[in-house]
Structures are given as structure tokens and as C-alpha cells.
Design a protein with these regions (language model features):
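Conserved GNAT acetyl-CoA-binding A-motif
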Residues: 66, 72-85, 234, 241-254
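Loop/helix-junction capping segments adjacent to catalytic residues or to phosphate/diphosphate-binding pockets
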Residues: 59, 90, 137, 209, ...
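Acetyl-CoA-dependent GNAT
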Residues: 1-49, 53-54, 66-68, 72, ...
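C-terminal "cap" of GNAT-fold acetyltransferases
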Residues: 82-99, 105-136, 150, 247-260, ...
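Active-site acidic-Proline motif in GNAT/NAT acetyltransferases
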Residues: 53-55, 59, 87-88, 221-223, ...
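A generic structural signal for beta-strand entry/edge sites
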Residues: 42-44, 80, 118, 210-212, ...
């Protein structure tokens, strides 16, 4: 039992504050950890006060508290979950990134005694977002997990099985640089608050090719297929291409892996086929199909 007024009187004020906002406050054990959640405008919920006693770091309590607050927010109809974290707390950044949060929006200064500056992290419950360079960097580890899962399931996306974690992470770090340079538009898709899919729009920069763009690394985690993420990602990429003035889209895909049927259903047409284009983990050579779509 915890005597709030005697042992932690500040908790009563915190609990009253979040209740007044229509939210909730949870504590664990003898105040070994705590978390709060409160609604914002527009269907978003904010996760606040995520604290775990240092002696329990790595024990899983932080994950349990965060998931408890997220479940409550989703049960209340949240469409997005946001939080703020000190720019100096790299361990916290990785923790949130492992739970599919990405950097989103500008930083904020609190003008407090510690001169705190905070990053804003967010994730939609469902849907697709375009990631800027900061968002891409914060998503690298989760995107690496998605890439490895797709490669392990047989996807033909330039890598052989098994794909080492460090190679997958190195690939996405390179993509972050290209996003920052404006060469690539990167999109991520969430389902039930989990970052589970991605696609890239590669913008051709040659003077004679500025009307073209290429769809690349179209990936949906095997555990999340059949939920419409593929269509949502392509919708976002094609809309962005049109906004950028690109009228011709190109891609290549392995015939018979399912993605080619999705593209055909969406109005893509086959422009050519190259036999023996890839040699994969089983030692066999496979064809690739070049497809195009005019916007």
C-alpha cells in the first residue's frame, strides 16, 4: 500500500491534473515507475511522465507502462500518439524508436532551470506519413527490422538471406542521408501503432529526366500483410510524385511474388522483362519485370 499524502504528495497533484484533462496517471510498485496519458485536439493523445527507477532500467517496466498508456489511448479512440523527450536522453530516444515512434515536428525549449530542449516524437495508430531527415534517422532501426523480415521471407530487394542487422541498419543510414539531400522521399506505414511498412520515391535529377521518378524498397512486414498497407503506401508515393511534377513512374519487381499483381491492379503496365536478372540465396537466377505508370 502507498500512502500518497505521506510518501509522494506530488502524485495527487499530478493525478488531479491529468484527470482534469480527461487523461489517466499510472504508477508501478513503490513508485518504481509511472506514466500518464491525456487527450489533445484532433484525436491525438499525449504520453507524459514516463519514468522508471534507474535500478529497474532494462527490466521491461518501461515497456509495460508505455504499452498500458497506449492501450488506454487507443481504447479512447486515439488516432495518433505523441510525446516529448529531452534531446540529451539518447537511451530514451532509442526506447521510443523501438516502439515505432519517430521524430516529428520542431523541437521545443522549456526555458526551465535546466534549459531543457525536447524532441517531439509521434506515431499514427494507422496510416502513412512522409518522413523528413530527422524522422528517417529516428526510424532507421525499425525500418531495418522490417527490411530483415522481408528479406527473410524471400523478398527480392537487393539483399541475400540472412541479412545481418548491421547491414540493414547501414542501408537505412544511407537512405537518411539521401532524404536529407532531397534525392529520396521516404514514407512509412503504421498498423495498430506499429511501423510495419515503407516505400521510397527516388526523384531523377538529370535535366532530361526530371519528369520521372522510381518506386523503390516497397516493403510490408510479413506479419502485417493483407491490411491495406501496400495500397496506402503506393497512394502516398504516387500522390507525392504528382505533386513534384513527375508524370512517369518506374519500378522493377520479381514476377510471381505478389507485388506484380498489386501493381497491375493499380494501373501499372509491364514495359519489359530481363531474364536472369538476380541470383538469390538459393543460387538460382530469377527474372525481373520493369513496370511503368503514367500520371
Amino acid at each position: 500500500m502507498l500512502d500518497v499524502d505521506l510518501e509522494a504528495p506530488e502524485l495527487r497533484a499530478l493525478a488531479s491534473y491529468y484527470r482534469g484533462r480527461g487523461g489517466m496517471l499510472w504508477v508501478a510498485g513503490e513508485v518504481d515507475g509511472m506514466v500518464a496519458a491525456a487527450p489533445l485536439d484532433g484525436g491525438a493523445w499525449e504520453i507524459c511522465r514516463v519514468y522508471v527507477h534507474p535500478r529497474l532500467h532494462g527490466a521491461g517496466l518501461g515497456r509495460e507502462l508505455l504499452e498500458l498508456a497506449e492501450r488506454h489511448a487507443l481504447a479512447q479512440g486515439a488516432t495518433e500518439v505523441v510525446l516529448w523527450t529531452d534531446t540529451r536522453f539518447r537511451r530514451a530516444h532509442r526506447f521510443y524508436e523501438n516502439h515505432s515512434y519517430v521524430r516529428a515536428g520542431p523541437i521545443r525549449a522549456l526555458h526551465d532551470i535546466a534549459n531543457t530542449v525536447e524532441y517531439r516524437y509521434a506515431k499514427p495508430v494507422h496510416g502513412v506519413r512522409q518522413l523528413d531527415a530527422a524522422g528517417a534517422q529516428s526510424a532507421e532501426r525499425r525500418l531495418a527490422d522490417v527490411l530483415r523480415a522481408c528479406v527473410d521471407s524471400g523478398a527480392s530487394v537487393s539483399f541475400l538471406r540472412p541479412l545481418a542487422p548491421e547491414r540493414a541498419l547501414d542501408f537505412w543510414q544511407g537512405i537518411t542521408r539521401r532524404v536529407g539531400q532531397g534525392e529520396v522521399l521516404l514514407f512509412a506505414a503504421w498498423s495498430e501503432g506499429v511501423l510495419a511498412g515503407t516505400v521510397q520515391l527516388v526523384l531523377h535529377t538529370a535535366e532530361i529526366g526530371r519528369h520521372r521518378a522510381e518506386i523503390a524498397k516497397f516493403l510490408v512486414h510479413p506479419a502485417f500483410r493483407g491490411r491495406g498497407l501496400g495500397d496506402a503506401l503506393l497512394d502516398a508515393a504516387e500522390a507525392a510524385a504528382a505533386t513534384a511534377g513527375r508524370t512517369l513512374l518506374l519500378l522493377d519487381t520479381k514476377p510471381g511474388d505478389g507485388a506484380d499483381r498489386l501493381y497491375a491492379r493499380r494501373g501499372w503496365t509491364e514495359a519489359g522483362r530481363i531474364e536472369g536478372y538476380t541470383r538469390e540465396s538459393d543460387g538460382r537466377e530469377y527474372a525481373t519485370v520493369i513496370m511503368l505508370k503514367r500520371l
